[in-house]
């Protein structure tokens, strides 16, 4: 019985340490995360911070603050996704790269292709890659993606309609 209690004590001590304390004994969970001050981005040990950073980046992108949003996404790119899909992260990275003041079409295309390599039916990446192909004078490739988008999302979807209207 003593052995069992000792084992339980050791396991509970180990688990509580790994659940959110740093080497100084301070809790890293809760509202006061240092991830926003860390140039490397959120810690891979704190999935909540990764999710918060991802959604913060999305909000910045929606507010057309593309460079700021992209920087955050780059900081969490290598982290394990929590509350989102990696394909979505790459889709937003592509969108922000393409929409910023000085668009980086090469990076944007690579991000969209990464998203599609993870999810070949990613509707956002299909639409936005089609827009990129149109913007870079590759209309045949854009039309090919329009056809694929029609199959995956349907011709009545907003994504299909937006790309269709751009091409016609």
Regions found by a protein language model. Give the residues of each.
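Structural motif corresponding to the intra-repeat A-B loop/turn of tetratricopeptide repeats
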Residues: 63, 100-102, 136
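Conserved structural position within tetratricopeptide repeats
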Residues: 78-81, 113-117, 151
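Residue-level recognition of tetratricopeptide repeat
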Residues: 86, 122, 156-157
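Canonical tetratricopeptide repeat
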Residues: 92, 128, 162-166
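TPR/TPR-like (Sel1-like) alpha-helical repeat modules
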Residues: 133-156
């Amino acid at each position: 019985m003593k052995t069992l209690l000792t084992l339980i004590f050791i396991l509970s001590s180990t688990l509580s340490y790994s659940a959110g304390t740093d080497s100084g004994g301070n809790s890293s969970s809760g509202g006061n995360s240092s991830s926003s001050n860390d140039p490397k981005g959120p810690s891979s040990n704190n999935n909540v911070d990764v999710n918060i950073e991802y959604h913060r980046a999305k909000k910045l992108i929606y507010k057309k603050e593309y460079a700021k949003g992209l920087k955050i996404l780059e900081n969490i790119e290598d982290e394990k996704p929590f509350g989102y899909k990696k394909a979505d992260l790459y889709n937003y990275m592509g969108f922000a790269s393409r929409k910023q003041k000085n668009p980086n079409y090469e990076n944007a295309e690579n991000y969209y292709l990464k998203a599609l390599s993870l999810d070949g039916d990613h509707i956002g990446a299909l639409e936005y890659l089609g827009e990129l192909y149109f913007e870079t004078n590759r209309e045949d490739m854009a039309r090919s993606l329009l056809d694929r988008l029609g199959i995956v999302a349907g011709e009545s979807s907003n994504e299909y309609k937006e790309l269709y209207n751009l091409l016609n």
